[in-house]
Amino acid sequence: MGSAGRLHYLAMTAENPTPGDLAPAPLITCKLCLCEQSLDKMTTLQECQCIFCTACLKQYMQLAIREGCGSPITCPDMVCLNHGTLQEAEIACLVPVDQFQLYQRLKFEREVHLDPYRTWCPVADCQTVCPVASSDPGQPVLVECPSCHLKFCSCCKDAWHAEVSCRDSQPIVLPTEHRALFGTDAEAPIKQCPVCRVYIERNEGCAQMMCKNCKHTFCWYCLQNLDNDIFLRHYDKGPCRNKLGHSRASVMWNRTQVVGILVGLGIIALVTSPLLLLASPCIICCVCKSCRGKKKKHDPSTT
């Protein structure tokens, strides 16, 4: 073969690489959706180096922002050894601008709530962060809002009461333009949670309320505790009768579902109890055998 033929052969082999050189890039399994994705569709977290597909991570972040109330967004891997936390720069790159602004606002509100030297003005329309003077733990101090000049207690958020305890204090004194929104009136649109005293606004809907701050469930009209009222019997009698805000049919359907769940759990317990009784001797024997083996292993007289 001449030199021209050898050059043509080398050019052909260079332009047509072997099949091994065209092997596809390795796929990585996402721990959230369990789908295999290429590396360009994955995102690695900076703090813990865990890797997930970008689409799943975006959905996870948006859900964490809506449900997390400003708490840090942790790695979605439940068995992450480094317990990684997502940085703000990562969140800003993966969620829309409005979602990131919501996260920053909720985060700031949470920081103020946990800071003993800052608190929110209890007037709903004010939303001013007020400085709290240092004091002994649990000792109430006078706080004055720099915007609306409301003077209130740092502990119970009621009007400042210098000579009485928080439980015996009078209702909070609000500016005239806000008094129609607050108070003990059953139809008032804004009330305080009976447990944590956070202000809650109700526009419409169900009268069974759950405080987002402390998870306490109560009746909006009389503020009675409903944590253990799974059948909603509170709205069958008394001053709150038929004030739940749902039709009678929906209430009966809810009670039917609760009864069905309880009956199902009872049936499962009845079915599994004989099996547990039959298997209990075997379980006890295995436990005793294991204990004897450990005792012999650590007994110095046997060595």
UniProtKB/Swiss-Prot annotation:
Q: What is the effect of changing residue 206 to A?
A: No loss in inhibitory effects on TBK1-induced IFN-beta promoter activity
The residues that the entry says bind Zn(2+) 5 are: 219, 222, 234, 240
GO BP term, example: ubiquitin-dependent protein catabolic process
State the EC number(s).
Answer: 2.3.2.31
Task: Locate the residues binding Zn(2+) 3.
Answer: 153, 156, 161, 166
Task: Cite the binding residues for Zn(2+) 2.
Answer: 121, 126, 145, 148
Which residues does the Swiss-Prot or TrEMBL record annotate as the active site? 206
Recorded topology in the membrane: Single-pass membrane protein
Record PTM text? Auto-ubiquitinated.
Checking PROSITE patterns in the record gives:
TRIAD (PS51873), ZF_RING_1 (PS00518)
Stretches the record annotates as TRIAD supradomain: 26-244
Reaction catalyzed: [E2 ubiquitin-conjugating enzyme]-S-ubiquitinyl-L-cysteine + [acceptor protein]-L-lysine = [E2 ubiquitin-conjugating enzyme]-L-cysteine + [acceptor protein]-N(6)-ubiquitinyl-L-lysine
The organism's place on the tree of life at top rank = Eukaryota
Q: In which tissues is it expressed?
A: Broadly expressed, with lowest levels in brain and thymus, and highest levels detectable in heart, ovary and testis.
Residues in coiled coil: none
Domain observations:
The RING-type zinc finger domain mediates binding to an E2 ubiquitin-conjugating enzyme. The transmembrane domain is essential for translocation to the mitochondria upon induction of apoptosis. Members of the RBR family are atypical E3 ligases. They interact with the E2 conjugating enzyme UBE2L3 and function like HECT-type E3 enzymes: they bind E2s via the first RING domain, but require an obligate trans-thiolation step during the ubiquitin transfer, requiring a conserved cysteine residue in the second RING domain.
Q: How does it assemble?
A: Interacts with UBE2L3, UBE2L6 and LCMT2, as well as with BAX. Interacts with TBK1; this interaction inhibits TBK1 phosphorylation and 'Lys-63'-linked polyubiquitination.
**Known PANTHER family for this protein?**
RBR FAMILY RING FINGER AND IBR DOMAIN-CONTAINING
Q: What is this protein called?
A: E3 ubiquitin-protein ligase RNF144B
Organism, by scientific name, is Homo sapiens (Human)
Q: Which gene encodes it?
A: RNF144B
